[in-house]
C-alpha cells in the first residue's frame, strides 16, 4: 500500500507524537463532543446553502436548513443524539440557536449571494515521491481567469499571531495538493473563523509550497522513525488541556496502553495516517483556538498573512 498522510494526522504528530500514536496506532475511541457536532452541523448547512439560487441564500434559509441537517447527522451517527435532549424542545432550540449564531456571524464575513463556489467539500489527493497527500477542502472558489481561492470554515476563534502558522499549515497543505493537481498555485488561502468573526488570509507562492512539501516529507520520515523505534514521546503543551487522552498520558501521571506488536504496520497504515474527516476540526483543535485567542497578540505574524477583524 502506498503511504498516505492527511493534514489532520500530520498536525497530530507535529503537536505530539504520543497523540499520533493514540489516534493512529492504538486507535482509541474519541466520543463526539458538542463542539465537534456543532461544527459538523454548521459545515453541513453552509455547504447545502449553496444548493439554493443565489438570491435565496439568506440567514432565514440557513436557519431552516438546520433541523434537517441535524436529523441527517443523527441518522448517520445515532450516538450524536446523546449530545442533545431532543425530547426537550427548549434544549433542542437552544442547540439550533447556538449553531445559528455561528452561521449568522458568517454572513457578516461573506456574502453567499455573490459567491458561486466551484467546489464544496472537495476531496483532493496527490502523490509526491511515493507519499499520498489527501484531504477535504471546504470550498474552492475559481475566478473566470482561473485564480483559485481555498476556503476553510472554523467554528472556533481565530488564533493569535503566535499560532497563525500552525493554523495555516493545513491550508498550505491543500494548496500544495491543488498546485500539484492543477499546475497553478492557489492565489489565496482563507480561514473563516465563525467563533470570533474573523478572516485569516494568506497568499502563498511556489517558494512557500516547496517549503511545505519539504516539511511534509520530513514529517513522514520522522513518523517512520517513530514507528520503527516504537518511540512516540509525549510533547506536553497548553494544547494538552484539550487532549481526550490526557488520563492515559505519562506526562500527566497516566499509563499508556502497551504498544501493539504490529505498531509499525498500524502507524504507517495509510487508512489511518491518511484519514480525512468532513468535520470542522477535531474537538481539541477547536478548543485550542479558543485558548490561543487569548495568547500574546504582540507576537509577529507572517508578513503576508492578513487577519480581517
Ligand atoms: S496530554 Fe498532551 S502530551 Fe499527553 S498525549 Fe495528549 S497532547 Fe500529548
Regions from the PLM with identified roles:
Residues 45-120, 298:
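A non-catalytic, helix-rich entry segment at domain boundaries
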Residues 34, 38, 42, 95, ...:
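Hydrophobic (often cysteine-bearing) scaffold residues that line and stabilize catalytic clefts
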Residues 4, 145, 177-309:
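Metal-dependent nuclease catalytic regions and adjoining charged, substrate-binding loops involved
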Residues 122-214:
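Mg2+/Mn2+-dependent nuclease catalytic core
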Residues 26-35, 51-57, 160-161, 229-232:
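Short, polar/flexible loop-turn hinges at active-site or ligand-entry regions and domain interfaces
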Residues 1-48, 306-309:
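Charged, glycine-rich intrinsically disordered N-terminal tails and low-complexity linkers that flank
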Residues 41-52, 222-226:
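Solvent-exposed, amphipathic alpha-helical segments
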Residues 14-22, 144-152, 217:
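Active-site-adjacent bridging/hinge elements
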